[in-house]
Amino acid sequence: MEEHTPHGIGNHAVILTEPCGEIAEKIRAFLEDIGYVGFSNFDIKYDQRDGKYKVFEINCRQGRSNYYVTGAGYNIAKLLVEDRVEGKDLPFVLADNPSLWRVVPRKVAFRYIVSDYHQEMKDLMRQGREVRPLFYHKDRPLLRTLRMEKNLLGHFQKFKRYYQRKS
């Protein structure tokens, strides 16, 4: 699910990771063919009209939402240090562990994501397979905590105004 405010459109609000080996293999082959080395992510959409995934953008960087990779069990910072600092030869690994990444309140996620995904989301939360990159239990000074809570509450109004509810 993405944000839909005029300023935030295109930013991720919720990500459910799932294995997708066929697409990952095609993208890996493409990156190797062009000699690309480094972090990247691709914007991919599933087209229900023809049952195919459509790749429409590569982002040659890691951004806020890339923390979902850590949520799936692969710490990007650790891999970067092992590769560039320690000089380790790291094999290709497909991050195929399911996880839930979100920056919106739980109620907003459940209200605006189609109900087909609700049980999976609940299961991942119960299993501790949820990551919330804006909240870290050791980084809770009062002013920051208040700002983060205000930010969270603001999503209720933003989604109500700009996003059509899914059922």
Q: Regions from the language model: what does each represent?
A:
Residues 1-35, 59-84:
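ATP-dependent carboxylate/phosphate-activation module, predominantly the ATP-grasp catalytic core
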Residues 52-57:
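Protein kinase-like catalytic core scaffold
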Residues 37-49:
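A short glycine-rich, hydrophobically flanked beta-strand micro-motif that places a catalytic Asp/Glu
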Residues 82-167:
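Peripheral (often C-terminal) accessory segments that flank ATP-dependent C-N-forming ligase machineries
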Residues 45, 61-64, 102:
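Basic side chains
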Residues 48, 76-79, 101:
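Short, surface-exposed, charged/polar-biased interaction segments
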Residues 41-43, 68-70, 93-94:
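Short acidic alpha-helical/loop segments enriched in Asp/Glu that coordinate divalent cations
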